[in-house]
């Protein structure tokens, strides 16, 4: 397109300038200025490159970085790549080529696209999680987690995906299928590396109160952690054996009419030689093992089960025998693997009892005794805090629920069969994958079965090249590395771990490595960490709420406990950008490639500054919004208009007649405040008001013009630099001082007030703020003179700055 502003010439020119002059290289040792650390969630370098949704969040941090630099901050704004991942591995399996080459090619593509968009990244700080210089320290931190007892190697049920040949974490499973590929996922018992998340639960919950994050994300994490305070009670089994349950509703214990055990738990295994229906029970267990946790709980529409015929538990409060069942909705890996069932006060139990013909015992009612539990349960949301009382509960009859909770707990504790306890919903973080393209676990399985981690001097343990990158028969691909797998060195003999770490390993601490990426003595210098942490602004998608955003907090908490992180929380402020949808409102991405808008196409036709301006003007940053090609054209027209005016020498004056004073100061104020609030769309709207005003005036004082260009350059850096140079400056605009405003000059001189007759608005009147009362009333009466004809004025009322009210008869 032929335009006044030639982006094809201007944008490459300034990108070359920034690179050659290292304009955005941060001296991390410069402690003379306040610091500002802006960070984007780093991307996985896929083969398809960026789509138009990617630049939105990146532009937001770029604007903030540029403004803070002008405000005198030492800014760190790095970029890197979360470069371990399944697509590269699938490429290796398909082609036989090492995934490193595929990954490096993709990184180059991504970096080229990001540079074309004009972001002020310090590329000298770039990291990639698949770089051995980086994952040496991922391995080192994992070793420290193991030495501290937080990383463990245990038997546990895992989410197994046969098609991918690997274990998946809970957040990688969606609706019973793998997040990537949509393949079936089943439960399987395996030895697994796990990290004990529960050890950090209280610190994670407390920390949420100290950080500026979206409340919705904090609530998601609270629910995922799932803290509940209750009582753990021991139940003996008739004929020998016992198990425990955890309950937050101890007040209902007299209403137990059955109990349910996890089909795949150890309790049931110990009863198989005593049940009267072993074939039926085993068949149910086998079916359960085909399901994942979501199938068994969240997605389970009807609660299935199978009786353990002939097996009964004894209720410790009254000695009554209750039948035992197995049900797939009870998970061996959560809580104790057993639950008590009170059909009258839990709707799930009520439905289960209906299906299996089990009795109902009501133990809570209102003070009138009018609660009916024959059609549905009377649950805790209905009775807690409502003055309800116990019934059918022996000596606790007539007590309020709240008093009975304490009294029943005391009785059971005194009997030695119960203890107060805190439970958490989230479980161990599975920290191993049967894949090749991930960090090797730096340990050896010795011949006696024990585990020994390698000395720090042997880190990093580097991935070997393979002829076959596919695992076979459920084994990890590294099983194919026969020579590498067998270890015999310095008196230590054994086999290496052949599972690798998950993709979430490197991303759990990468924000620290940016600060000191070339350090080969420690993961980052402690003095630098103390100065730069925490991250001041972190921008990324909400889909990472219980994955990366939780894992990062866990790793940071661990490092903090060891004196290796200076802060309790890694990310001070978190913002989720909304999705940019296709023109038809469908999400851009690999599922619908036909709706993807390629940013390179927009940059080619309209320029990077147009793309940046358009995406920031689409609407609030946090809101999802559809792409609109017509509005892209509108953004470009605005830039042409700006360029045309401010590069015309005759339009820029060294004198100031005061006509633009108010709109200028209002613009500086609003843009400054809106940038701080990340309200870029309204900041741009104010810039447009200013541009309209200067066009109307026909000229602009040099001070106002230059300061406007500074502000615009944060959003549109190429055109900003170009106009700055045309106005006679040799150096980059990036380090110029941010403009200031005079509050007194932002105030409107006039206000609009209502003119009323007998309290009803008849007109509006523009008046000066300092106009005297008599003058305002006179103007108001003059404005509505035709409506006052023939009326007798009884009273004239003036509320300063608001209304004139003429009372008539």
Q: For the regions a protein language model found, what residue spans apply to each?
A:
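Helix-rich, typically C-terminal accessory recognition domains appended to large enzymatic cores
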Residues: 82, 147-159, 335, 420-449, ...
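N-terminal catalytic cores of NTP/NDP-binding nucleotidyl/phosphoryl-transfer enzymes
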Residues: 27-99, 103, 127-141, 247-248, ...
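Alpha-helical recognition segments enriched in aromatics with Gly/Pro capping
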Residues: 311-317, 321-334, 363, 480, ...
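Residue patterns forming the tRNA-binding/recognition surfaces of aminoacyl-tRNA synthetases
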Residues: 4, 13, 17-21, 94-250, ...
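NTP-handling and nucleic-acid-processing catalytic cores
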Residues: 3, 7-15, 138-365, 473-475, ...
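Conserved oxyanion/phosphate-binding beta-strand-loop segments in alpha/beta enzyme cores
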Residues: 1-39, 69-78, 101-109, 213, ...
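Glycine- and acidic
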Residues: 1, 41-50, 122-127, 331-339, ...
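Conserved phosphate/anionic-ligand binding catalytic regions in large, soluble enzymes, centered on
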Residues: 243-265, 429, 435-437, 441, ...
């Amino acid at each position: 397109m032929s335009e006044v502003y030639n982006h094809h010439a201007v944008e490459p020119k300034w990108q070359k300038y920034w690179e050659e002059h290292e304009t955005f290289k941060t001296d991390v040792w410069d402690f003379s200025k306040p610091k500002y650390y802006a960070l984007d969630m780093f991307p996985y370098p896929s083969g398809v490159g960026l789509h138009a949704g990617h630049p939105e969040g990146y532009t937001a941090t770029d604007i903030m970085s540029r403004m803070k630099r002008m405000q005198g901050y030492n800014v760190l704004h790095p970029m890197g790549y979360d470069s371990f991942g399944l697509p590269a591995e699938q490429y290796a399996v398909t082609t036989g080529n090492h995934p490193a080459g595929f990954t490096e090619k993709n990184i180059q593509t991504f970096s080229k696209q990001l540079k074309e968009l004009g972001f002020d990244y310090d590329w000298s700080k770039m990291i990639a999680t698949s770089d051995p210089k980086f994952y040496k320290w991922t391995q080192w931190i994992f070793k420290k987690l193991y030495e501290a007892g937080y990383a463990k190697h245990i038997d546990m049920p895992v989410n197994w995906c046969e098609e991918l040949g690997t274990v998946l974490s809970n957040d990688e499973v969606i609706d019973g299928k793998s997040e990537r590929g949509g393949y079936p996922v089943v439960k399987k018992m395996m030895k697994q590396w796990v990290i004990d998340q529960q050890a950090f639960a209280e610190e994670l919950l407390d920390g949420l109160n100290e950080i500026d994050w979206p409340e919705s994300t904090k609530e998601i994490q609270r629910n995922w952690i799932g803290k509940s305070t209750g009582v753990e009670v021991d139940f003996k089994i008739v004929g020998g054996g016992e198990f425990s349950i955890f309950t937050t509703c101890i007040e209902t214990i007299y209403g137990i009419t059955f109990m349910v055990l996890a089909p795949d738990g150890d309790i049931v295994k110990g009863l198989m030689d005593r049940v009267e229906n072993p074939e039926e029970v085993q068949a149910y267990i086998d079916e359960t093992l085909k399901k994942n946790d979501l199938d068994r709980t969240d997605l389970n529409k009807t609660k299935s089960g199978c009786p353990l015929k002939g097996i009964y538990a004894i209720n410790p409060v009254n000695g009554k025998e209750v039948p035992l069942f197995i049900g797939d909705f009870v998970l061996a890996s959560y809580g104790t693997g057993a639950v008590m069932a009170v059909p009258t006060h839990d709707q799930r139990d009520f439905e289960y009892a209906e299906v299996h013909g089990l009795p109902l015992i009501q133990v809570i009612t209102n003070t009138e005794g009018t609660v009916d539990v024959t059609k549905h349960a009377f649950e805790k949301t209905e009775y807690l805090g409502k003055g309800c009382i116990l019934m059918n509960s022996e000596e606790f009859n007539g007590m309020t629920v709240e008093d009975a909770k304490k009294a029943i707990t005391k009785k059971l504790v005194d009997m030695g069969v119960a203890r107060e306890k805190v439970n958490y919903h989230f479980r161990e973080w599975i920290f191993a994958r049967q894949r090749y393209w991930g960090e090797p676990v730096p340990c050896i399985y010795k011949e006696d079965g024990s585990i020994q981690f390698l000395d720090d001097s042997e880190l990093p343990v580097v991935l070997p090249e393979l002829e076959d990158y596919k695992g076979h028969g459920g084994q990890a691909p590294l099983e194919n590395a026969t020579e590498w797998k067998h270890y015999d060195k310095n008196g230590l003999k054994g086999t290496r771990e052949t599972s690798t770490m998950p993709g979430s390993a490197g991303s759990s601490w990468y924000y620290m490595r940016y600060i000191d990426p070339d350090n080969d003595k420690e993961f980052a210098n402690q003095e630098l960490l103390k100065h730069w942490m925490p991250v001041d602004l972190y921008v990324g998608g909400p889909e990472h709420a219980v994955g990366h955003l939780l894992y990062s907090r866990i790793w940071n908490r661990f490092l903090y406990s060891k004196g290796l992180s200076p802060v309790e929380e890694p990310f001070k402020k978190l913002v989720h950008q909304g999705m940019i949808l296709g023109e038809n409102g469908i999400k851009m991405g690999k599922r619908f490639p036909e709706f993807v808008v390629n940013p390179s196409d927009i940059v080619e036709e309209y320029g990077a500054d147009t793309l940046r301006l358009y995406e920031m003007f689409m609407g609030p940053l946090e809101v999802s919004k559809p792409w609109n090609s017509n509005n892209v054209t509108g953004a470009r027209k605005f830039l042409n208009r700006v360029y045309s005016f401010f590069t015309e020498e005759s339009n820029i004056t060294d004198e100031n007649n005061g006509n633009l004073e108010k709109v200028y100061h209002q613009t500086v104020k609003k843009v400054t405040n809106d940038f701080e609030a990340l309200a870029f769309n309204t900041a741009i709207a104010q810039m447009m008001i200013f541009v309209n005003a200067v066009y109307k005036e026909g000229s602009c004082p040099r001070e106002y013009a230059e300061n406007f260009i500074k502000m615009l350059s944060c959003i549109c850096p190429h055109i900003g630099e170009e106009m700055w140079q045309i106005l006679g400056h040799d150096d980059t605009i990036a380090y110029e001082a941010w403009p200031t405003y005079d509050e007194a000059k932002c105030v409107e001189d006039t206000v609009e007030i209502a003119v009323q007759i007998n309290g009803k608005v008849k007109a509006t009147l523009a008046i000066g703020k300092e106009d005297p009362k008599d003058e305002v009333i006179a103007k108001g009466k003059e404005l509505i003179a035709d409506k006052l004809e023939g009326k007798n004025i009884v009273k004239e009322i003036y509320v300063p700055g608001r209304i004139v009210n003429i009372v008539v008869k």
